[in-house]
Regions:
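Basic, polar low-complexity surface loops/patches
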Residues: 1-148
Length: 148
């Protein structure tokens, strides 16, 4: 069974919890969860399938991340792929859980950053096109107009 299938199954039960998957010396989260983690820690999001993103971090960062989530009262569960995705650790703030609140904030900010990355990638991939200078001048003009 693929990791995304397992995550979807886990999220059916823990839909308002950040699910961390331990893979060796790294932890990964997927979908909405990755937006929240990227929002707080500026970890890079990786597109893994259609519009599903993931992000990962080394195990030595786990305590810092969990402390932040606990401070913000965001539920989480940690599962280990090697142990058939059994829950190793979890925190449940019950009605105080602020997962949705921070997901909405993260979705907006991270969504904007992803759009900027796509624009940047397009520009870099098309530096050899004849109209790229005109496009860049137009972008610079817009930035100047709005005083950015």
């Amino acid at each position: 069974m693929s990791i995304l299938t397992m995550i979807k199954n886990i999220k059916q039960v823990h839909n308002k919890d950040i699910v961390f998957v331990k893979l060796g010396k790294f932890y990964y989260c997927y979908g909405k969860d990755s937006y929240i983690i990227s929002f707080f820690f500026e970890y890079k999001l990786n597109l893994i399938e259609n519009s599903i993103y993931s992000c990962g971090f080394p195990s030595q960062s786990l305590n810092k991340i969990l402390a932040k989530l606990e401070n913000k009262k965001i539920n989480y569960v940690i599962v280990d792929r090697r142990n058939n995705y059994e829950i190793e650790n979890k925190e449940d703030f019950k009605k105080l859980n602020s997962y949705d609140k921070y997901y909405e904030k993260a979705k907006e900010e991270v969504g904007i950053k992803l759009r900027i990355q796509k624009i940047n990638a397009y520009l870099l991939e098309n530096t050899d096109k004849s109209n790229i200078k005109k496009l860049i001048l137009n972008i610079e003009g817009l930035l100047q107009k709005y005083k950015f």
